[in-house]
Amino acid sequence: MPTFTGPSSPRYADYRERLRGEHLPLAYVDVELLLANAADLVARSGGKPIRLASKSIRCRELMRRVLASSPVFQGVLCFSAGEAAHLAAHGFTDLVVAYPTVDAHDLAAVCAQVKHGAQICLMVDEP
């Protein structure tokens, strides 16, 4: 697996060169390392399904790449109902909302997406 070890690594020098002259701040993702990390998770999963946590990757395109990298990745664990509705509107399926919600706007958005065929599972706390 490729590694990044900080300012002394060859990757750091490559990043500095690639970003020279760019207006900062910006987001830069080494997709090779991202997918290597995903492959490592798959290898350690023992074949068990892995649900991608959206709060760890806030970029839809990167989420799509990780999900497509292995059939072991199955669905997305969303931070909020609103986020689940947003992801469903952008073609994501098999969504689970990690935290209970009573936000009427977010719940209406989820219901609208479910009416259009989205699969969104909401969690609840039972007293």
Task: Give the role of each language-model region.
Residues 51-127:
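Active-site-proximal beta-alpha core segment in soluble small-molecule metabolic enzymes
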Residues 4, 22-36:
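N-terminal basic, low-complexity leaders that serve as flexible interaction/assembly modules and, when applicable
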Residues 9-14, 80-84:
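Short, acidic/polar
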Residues 35-38, 111:
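A generic alpha-helix structural signal
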Residues 1-10:
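N-terminal hydrophobic targeting/anchoring segments and the immediately downstream early-domain regions
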Residues 10-27:
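Generic N-terminal amphipathic, Lys/Arg-enriched alpha-helix
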Residues 37-45:
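N-terminal signal-anchor module of multipass membrane proteins
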